[in-house]
């Protein structure tokens, strides 16, 4: 980090260098303009300036308010008394001493403490010195007495020892012992007196210090009577309240019938019975007085029943599949902040409303010491789906065959020949844009066909077709070979584990090459039985019917090998192949029945929707009443349009079906919300990198759910770094007034695929000038959206050389300056176009023409092979041999 000088710091803070040096000097830091400033010195200067300007001043005044409510019994008219509530409000203002007064008082207190300590030490030293002197005097007197006694004994000692001498010695020893005892007693007495004296001095000092402390406190109170503590103020107020209550209370006479609880309680409710019960039960007295005419009840206790738990309460926490932080905290009887803290310790940042999955919630609860019980919120769903037929008879069923392949390879035409109907001509543009489900009766049995689109946009449709099928027929044109959607169909079949039969179509064409098809398919793992593989190859022609019978026989043979079986009787189950919103009939779903028999009037649970089957139709539009396994059928009566690929199940109870559908919808919303609540940080950085991106807003409506998904995926794939497709609304059904209003508000294009706008929507379109477009072929829709996105791209500019002139001579003009006499060697020289001057094929100047003349006449252009005079604006260094290049900038439209 580079050092900061005073001059640089002054520039940063917007002050003059002299002023900053002066402020440093006032803060006790000597600096010059060229000196460096450390972070510590900056902080020191900042603290000084804050203190000088009062930035860290604390509040010096505080006001406390207290309110107490009591009840006073007042005699009224007619000898009756009434209760009057008395409210007492008290207000105290506490003012903090200023710093000077506080410092002065603190210094005085410190001096008093030092003085007291010095006096105590002095008294202790005096007592110790006196005790020491007394002890030394006693020892000296004892030694002198012993010496005198010894000298006396030695002088009076006779030469021979007699009995009298022994008696004298004994008496002398007794005397000495008595003297020693007297000396010891005297020494003990003197020591005790010295200790008493020291104790007396200490007590006097303590008494004197207490008096001085009392005097100091009185002096402080006299200085400022507001200086006190909130505890003392509250205690004084409580004492005053208690004295006032005692003065206004009369003693209660003892009850005549003390054993009667009812009388005792009634007496306690009278005004004269307040004295004995005390302050804690005044509320009971007021309640009794307010309800004189009602039956008396036992006085309730004012004590709360809560006891502080001795240990952490460990509860059993029931956790579902998803739970929010607030809900988990409520179940654990703790604050949500505790869970947030715990998850921060575990390395995860969450908010109080964030949804946690079951595993994360279990870890948090167990970490905090609770017992976790995992529950399944979809228990009702499992019960409803499990409440079906038990042991039922299994019978063989017809195979479900999906026809897949590249676009225009003849899938639908092949199915046409089998069904003896012209289906392909009915599809817009001659291409299939829906999943068509049909069943045909042959001599050897029934076969159900699913015809999937071959266009690249319908990947999801083909995946659903492969999922619901038993056998896949891969149609490959003999004259075209393997194409991208052919490879994709092979991948779908392998992913689903479905056997594959290859139908080599268009075998009647002269350019057909079946061997090339076999060779190309072998590179993708599809080997012919002729080459030792497992896949059946059949050469067919949808035009003249060649090989159709062999294909049907191969399908039935493969189905016999697979031993396809299903429950024929009982409650039906199937899969939604396609769905749409019909304006006259409502939500319509094409369901392929996989087991059981679907009957009119059954309760169907289908994904997020449910309903009673009001009507059933086959693929030809004829009304039917029931449909068995492997039969495609259109059903009416659902609550909404289900998604293609949802499972359709017949249940017993409509109420439970509605509950399961609502639960699924709520779960879908929760999952969507949890997906939206993911960390925004990555999105923020991604948006910063993207910069300004053009957006093409679309409101998309289609006739069926599958086409809607395919179109939306294809349009989203067109997005680039510069232009993005934003589908703000999508749905199945016609364009409504709501769609038109939304498109007008968001400046979007309304796109209808095989649907139309109603009258109200057309009015909004006309009044708001909304761009409304109808399409029936997906190719056209994608191409036009791509063209619209291309128009939003920033254009590119290219410079094109339109003329070249060579300088043959240079003339001087008094008005313009140097005039170059030139010969046009290439193209045309235009007066309005920019130029470059080249010398030895190097650009030395770029500018514009000031004049262009031919024979003294101003002209707008000069063509190839003609002479002219050229005056270059703001440039006079034109020489013979230079070249003047004329160019123009051309805008080139970009495409995706």
From Swiss-Prot:
Region (G3): 451-454
SUPFAM superfamilies (UniProt xref): Initiation factor IF2/eIF5b, domain 3, P-loop containing nucleoside triphosphate hydrolases, Putative DNA-binding domain, Translation proteins
GO cellular component: cytosol
Region of interest: G5: 541-543
Main location (coarse class): cytoplasm
Residue segments, region G4: 505-508
Ranges where the record places region G2: 430-434
Domain of life where this protein originates: Bacteria
Region (Disordered): 117-303
Compositionally skewed regions (Basic and acidic residues) per UniProt: 117-174, 196-227
Biased composition (Low complexity): 175-195, 254-268
InterPro entries named among the record's database cross-references: DNA-bd_dom_put_sf, EF-G-like_DII, EFTu-like_2, IF2_assoc_dom_bac, IF2_II, IF2_N, P-loop_NTPase, Small_GTP-bd
Keywords: Cytoplasm, GTP-binding, Initiation factor, Nucleotide-binding, Protein biosynthesis
Region G1, annotated ranges: 405-412
Record domain tr-type G: where: 396-563
Localization terms from the record: Cytoplasm
HAMAP family membership: IF_2_B
Family assignment from sequence similarity: Belongs to the TRAFAC class translation factor GTPase superfamily. Classic translation factor GTPase family. IF-2 subfamily.
Function in brief: One of the essential components for the initiation of protein synthesis. Protects formylmethionyl-tRNA from spontaneous hydrolysis and promotes its binding to the 30S ribosomal subunits. Also involved in the hydrolysis of GTP during the formation of the 70S ribosomal complex.
PANTHER family xrefs: TR-TYPE G DOMAIN-CONTAINING PROTEIN, TRANSLATION INITIATION FACTOR IF-2-RELATED
NCBIfam families found in the cross-reference section: IF-2, small_GTP
UniProt name for this protein: Translation initiation factor IF-2
Lineage: Bacteria, Pseudomonadati, Pseudomonadota, Gammaproteobacteria, Alteromonadales
């Amino acid at each position: 980090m580079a050092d900061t000088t005073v001059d640089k710091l002054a520039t940063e803070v917007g002050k003059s260098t002299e002023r900053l040096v002066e402020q440093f000097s006032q803060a006790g830091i000597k600096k010059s303009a060229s000196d460096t400033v450390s972070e510590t010195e900056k902080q020191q200067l900042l603290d000084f300036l804050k203190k000088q300007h009062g930035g860290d001043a604390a509040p010096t005044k505080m006001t406390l308010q207290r309110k107490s409510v009591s009840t006073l019994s007042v005699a009224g008219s007619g000898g009756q008394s009434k209760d009057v509530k008395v409210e007492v409000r008290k207000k105290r203002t506490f003012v903090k001493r200023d710093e000077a007064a506080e410092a002065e008082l603190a210094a005085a207190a410190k001096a008093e403490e030092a003085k007291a300590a010095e006096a105590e030490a002095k008294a202790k030293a005096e007592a110790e010195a006196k005790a020491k002197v007394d002890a030394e005097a006693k020892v000296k007197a004892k030694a002198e007495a012993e010496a005198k006694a010894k000298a006396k004994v030695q002088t009076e000692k006779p030469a021979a020892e007699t009995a009298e001498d022994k008696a004298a010695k004994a008496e002398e020893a007794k005397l000495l012992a008595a003297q020693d005892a007297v000396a010891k007693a005297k020494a003990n007495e003197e020591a005790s007196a010295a200790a008493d004296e020291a104790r007396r001095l200490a007590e006097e000092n303590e008494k004197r210090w207490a008096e001085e402390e009392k005097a100091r406190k009185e002096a402080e109170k006299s200085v400022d009577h507001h200086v006190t503590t909130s505890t003392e103020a509250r205690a004084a107020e409580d004492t005053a309240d208690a004295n006032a209550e005692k003065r206004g209370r009369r003693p209660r006479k003892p009850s005549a019938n003390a054993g009667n609880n009812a009388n005792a309680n009634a007496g306690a409710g009278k005004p004269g019975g307040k004295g004995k019960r005390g302050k804690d039960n005044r509320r009971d007295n007021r309640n009794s007085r307010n309800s004189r005419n009602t039956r008396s009840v036992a006085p309730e206790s004012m004590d709360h029943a809560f006891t502080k738990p001795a240990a952490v309460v460990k509860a059993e926490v029931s956790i579902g599949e998803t739970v929010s932080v607030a809900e988990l905290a409520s179940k654990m009887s703790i604050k949500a902040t505790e869970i947030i803290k715990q998850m921060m310790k575990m390395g995860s940042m969450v908010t109080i409303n964030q949804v946690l999955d079951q595993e994360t919630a279990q870890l948090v609860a167990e970490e905090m010491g609770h017992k976790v019980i995992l529950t399944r919120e979809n228990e009702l769903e499992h019960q409803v789906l499990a409440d079906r037929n038990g042991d039922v008879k299994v019978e063989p069923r017809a195979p479900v065959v999906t026809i897949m392949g590249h676009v225009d390879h003849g899938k639908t035409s092949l199915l046409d020949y089998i069904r003896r109907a012209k289906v392909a001509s009915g599809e817009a543009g001659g291409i299939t844009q829906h999943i068509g489900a049909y069943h045909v009766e042959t001599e050897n049995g029934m076969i159900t066909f699913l015809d999937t689109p071959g266009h690249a946009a319908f990947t999801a449709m083909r995946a659903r077709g492969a999922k619901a099928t038993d056998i896949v027929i891969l149609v490959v044109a003999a004259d075209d070979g393997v194409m991208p959607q052919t490879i994709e169909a092979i991948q779908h079949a392998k992913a689903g584990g479905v056997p594959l039969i290859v139908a080599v179509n268009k075998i009647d064409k002269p350019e057909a090459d079946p061997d090339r098809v076999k060779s190309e398919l072998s590179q993708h793992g599809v080997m012919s039985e002729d080459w030792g593989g497992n896949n059946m190859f059949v050469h067919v022609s949808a035009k003249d019917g060649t090989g159709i019978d062999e294909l049907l026989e191969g399908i039935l043979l493969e189905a016999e090998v697979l031993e396809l079986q299903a429950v024929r009787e009982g409650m039906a189950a199937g899969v939604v192949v396609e769905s749409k919103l019909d304006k006259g009939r409502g939500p319509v779903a094409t369901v392929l029945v996989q087991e059981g028999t679907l009957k009119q009037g059954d309760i169907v649970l289908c994904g997020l929707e449910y309903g009673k089957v009001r009507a059933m139709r086959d693929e030809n539009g004829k009304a039917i009443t029931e449909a068995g396994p492997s039969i495609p059928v259109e059903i009416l009566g659902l609550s909404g349009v289900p998604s293609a690929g949802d499972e359709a199940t017949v249940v017993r109870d409509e109420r439970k079906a509605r509950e399961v559908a609502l639960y699924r919808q709520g779960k879908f919303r929760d999952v969507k919300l949890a997906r939206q609540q993911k960390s925004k940080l990555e999105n923020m950085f991604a948006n910063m990198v993207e910069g300004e991106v053009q957006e093409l807003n679309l409101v998309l409506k289609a006739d069926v759910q599958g086409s809607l998904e395919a179109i939306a995926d294809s349009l989203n794939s067109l997005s680039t770094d510069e232009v993005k497709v934003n589908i703000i609304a999508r749905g199945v059904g016609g364009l409504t007034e709501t769609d038109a209003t939304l498109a007008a508000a968001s400046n979007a294009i309304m796109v209808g695929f095989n649907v139309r706008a109603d009258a109200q929507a057309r009015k909004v379109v006309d009044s708001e000038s909304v761009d409304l477009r109808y399409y029936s072929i997906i190719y056209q829709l994608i191409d036009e959206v791509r063209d619209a996105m291309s128009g939003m791209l920033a254009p590119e500019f290219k410079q094109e050389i339109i003329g070249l002139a060579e300088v043959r001579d240079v003339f001087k003009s008094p008005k313009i300056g140097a005039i170059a006499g030139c010969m046009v060697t290439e193209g045309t020289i235009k007066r309005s176009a920019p130029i470059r001057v080249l010398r030895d094929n190097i650009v030395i100047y770029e500018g514009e023409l000031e004049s262009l003349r031919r024979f003294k006449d101003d002209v707008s252009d000069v063509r190839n092979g003609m002479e002219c005079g050229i005056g270059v604006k703001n440039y006079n260094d034109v020489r013979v041999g230079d070249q003047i290049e004329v160019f123009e900038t051309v805008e080139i439209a970009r495409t995706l």
